A protein has these predicted regions:
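A short beta-loop-alpha structural element at the N-terminal edge
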Residues: 2-16
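Amide-forming acyltransferase catalytic core, primarily the GNAT-like/NAT-type
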Residues: 15-16, 21-24, 28-44, 124, ...
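Basic, Lys/Arg-rich alpha-helical nucleic-acid-recognition elements, primarily the DNA-binding modules
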Residues: 38, 46, 63-66, 72, ...
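Short hydrophobic/aromatic beta-strand element in the GNAT-like acyltransferase core
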Residues: 46-50, 61, 83, 205-209
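Active-site/acyl-donor-binding loops of N-acyltransferases
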Residues: 47, 66, 113-163, 212-235, ...
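Glycine-rich phosphate/pyrophosphate-binding loop shared by adenosine-nucleotide-utilizing enzymes
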Residues: 56-61, 79, 212-216, 224
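Conserved acetyl-CoA binding element of GNAT-fold acetyltransferases
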Residues: 75-88, 221-233
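Conserved acetyl-CoA-binding loop-helix of GNAT-fold acetyltransferases
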Residues: 86, 91-105, 235-246
Length: 307
């Protein structure tokens, strides 16, 4: 079968709505996707390609999200590998590889230095074929059970009800979002969490809460996910985790989830009381020069496109 390939744009992105449902059995809005791929504040925008059948049906997509990135101590533009989707009836036809290569070529033309990402077990083999490089340590996840039953998850799967639930969350929790001062000085390589980053991340519904002078950037989508924390240390960690778990239970979340790079400050604090496990590989593909090292890069949950 022949496929027509078109670049992602503010117009064509609406075709991802039915494709998203067919590929992932999840409903997303055109508005959500538009905000996610609108990265004008960084420079390059709508970096990705869609494959169509001769009848005009969108059946595959691959896209990356440009961001400011610290690489070897210097500020550059990188891009995070984001949505990878293929309609179930059009898989194993080479569409992922084709769209990815076109996307990387476009990104290179836009002077994007590298693509990075956290592929799951299903997409990992495909990225290996694309000659991605992977760090020796994966992202680490810490999971705390908060309740035996998650009504938040049930609501999350019902868009109409979850909208009402989100309105209630906005009433119970702060609708404040973090700014650059929340993160402090950038020391390690990785995503630069400046005001541009913080404004962009508003495409997802998140909240900023304070527990005993510790601030946490959270997302509630059936689970309570911690994007980043400020002020956490060995002395207050136990009390913070206990209060956070209680909040998660009241919000109907079964689990509290932290995710961070190994050897980060957050990792060092959490591992004293919680047991980590591997979450996702950390991979990258240089686009401008093969002499790229990500050995000193560190990531938090908030850096991922799924937070």
């Amino acid at each position: 079968m022949d496929y027509r390939i078109e670049k992602l744009s503010a117009e064509t992105i609406r075709h991802l709505v039915p494709l998203y449902k067919a590929a992932f059995h999840q409903k997303v809005s055109y508005k959500f996707l538009l905000k996610k791929y609108d990265t004008r504040s960084v420079g390059p925008e709508f970096i990705g390609f869609i494959a169509y059948t001769s009848e005009g049906l969108a059946v595959a997509f691959y896209g990356v999200i440009p961001c400011f990135f610290q690489l070897n101590g210097k500020k550059v533009i990188a891009a995070q590998s984001a949505d990878t989707m293929t309609h179930p009836q059009h898989r194993k036809k080479g569409l992922f590889q084709n769209l990815a290569l076109k996307t990387y070529a476009l990104a290179a033309e836009q002077r994007i230095q590298l693509v990075f990402g956290f592929p799951n077990q299903d997409s990992y083999p495909g990225f290996m074929k694309l000659k991605w490089q992977f760090l020796p340590d994966q992202l680490q996840v810490f999971t705390i059970k908060a309740a035996n039953f998650s009504y938040s998850r049930l609501l999350y799967r019902t868009p109409g009800l979850f909208s009402i639930y989100n309105m209630l969350l906005n009433g119970l929790l702060s609708v404040e979002h973090p700014d650059a001062s929340f993160f402090g000085e950038k020391i390690s390589d990785g995503v630069i969490r400046d005001d541009t980053f913080c404004l962009y991340k508003k495409y997802n519904a998140t909240h900023l809460i304070t527990i005993d002078k510790v601030k946490a950037w959270i997302k509630v989508d059936g689970k309570l996910k911690i994007g980043a924390v400020q002020g956490l240390n060995e002395n207050n960690a136990a009390g913070f985790i206990q209060r956070l778990t209680s909040i998660a239970s009241r919000l109907g979340c079964r689990d509290v989830i932290f995710m961070t790079s190994k050897y980060s400050l957050l990792y060092e604090v959490l591992k004293k009381t919680l047991t980590p496990r591997d979450a996702f590989p950390i991979g990258f593909l240089p686009l401008q020069s093969e002499k790229v090292s990500m050995a000193d890069a560190s990531f938090e949950y908030c850096d991922a496109d799924f937070f």
